[in-house]
């Protein structure tokens, strides 16, 4: 009876809160690719942080951890000329969205993503930015001690250049000179949303985190929309099945990815023939391998080098009408001290766009970070 009285009192005094809580319980709000509602996010993040701090007290200093970004400025005339020269010869066999201009459009995301790492992850040893003979306008000499540009030709065999295929570029991350064994891979549309400890990515004993999504690859295929990422992940599963008894059906969350250089070397040793088979693909095709975002993380897991961990990442398409509400939510969460771990402001399909989608993104990033 007391419980009913409290509910009735809440209805009378704060009807808007009563109905909000009722609807949230009946229809939970989800912002992530995980099986958790918005009401659970803050508790999950707090629990992870407390556990990381306990581990910190019981371990020695972490090994070096680097960060790697891949970046392209699709508005660069030199890059456009190169793309126009090669792309027409490969478009016929390219995969869904592979030639969509949204994949190469630069909204200055890299500036915010890199500076978020510098602000919220000061323990990172070094940041490497992989480019195709390009340099971010904001990168000056004062940052060179912490940030190094890596050109495609520094790590990718010349016979595969130029390439406009991120899957190919990601297959050579381990070739970066002076890269640490443990590193975190970022696309430039992934942003750190709060302070994160090294233990969120790697334990002091070397075990990496693998941020697995609740999504299903088989259900994606059943929908009939065969993306290059889906095909490349399925191909990766077939390779993994040659060495392990697996039932993999889960992709990773769209966020940063902890990786190990030694696991890259193992993959090349085991799967060299399959790798060499897709490297000539200058655009994404349906016979690529999903290296950094799937093959290596799952290889690390089956080799006992990684274990599942939760990352609360808000994932959305910046051209979608839903982006506006997500921007407002991110800023509100920050004011409340309930920020997610990260967010991914994805841009891959230019067929439909809300007005001012770019300005909306930049305005939100400016308000969020205030760099």
UniProtKB/Swiss-Prot annotation:
Name of the top EC class for this enzyme? transferase
Example GO biological process = polysaccharide biosynthetic process
Source organism, top-level taxon: Bacteria
Q: Which GO terms describe its molecular function?
A: transferase activity, transferring phosphorus-containing groups
Query: Which controlled-vocabulary keywords does the entry list?
Result: Exopolysaccharide synthesis, Transferase
Keyword Transferase in annotation: yes
Task: Give EC number(s), comma-separated.
Answer: 2.7.-.-
Role of this protein = Part of a capsular polysaccharide synthesis locus.
Q: What else is known?
A: Stealth proteins are part of a protein family that is conserved from bacteria to higher eukaryotes. Family members were first identified in microbes as proteins that help pathogens to elude the host innate immune system. Microbial stealth proteins are involved in the biosynthesis of exopolysaccharides. Stealth proteins are predicted to function as hexose-1-phosphoryltransferases.
The UniProt entry, under PANTHER family, shows: N-ACETYLGLUCOSAMINE-1-PHOSPHOTRANSFERASE SUBUNITS ALPHA_BETA (PTHR24045:SF0), PTHR24045
Q: What is this protein called?
A: Capsular polysaccharide phosphotransferase cps12A
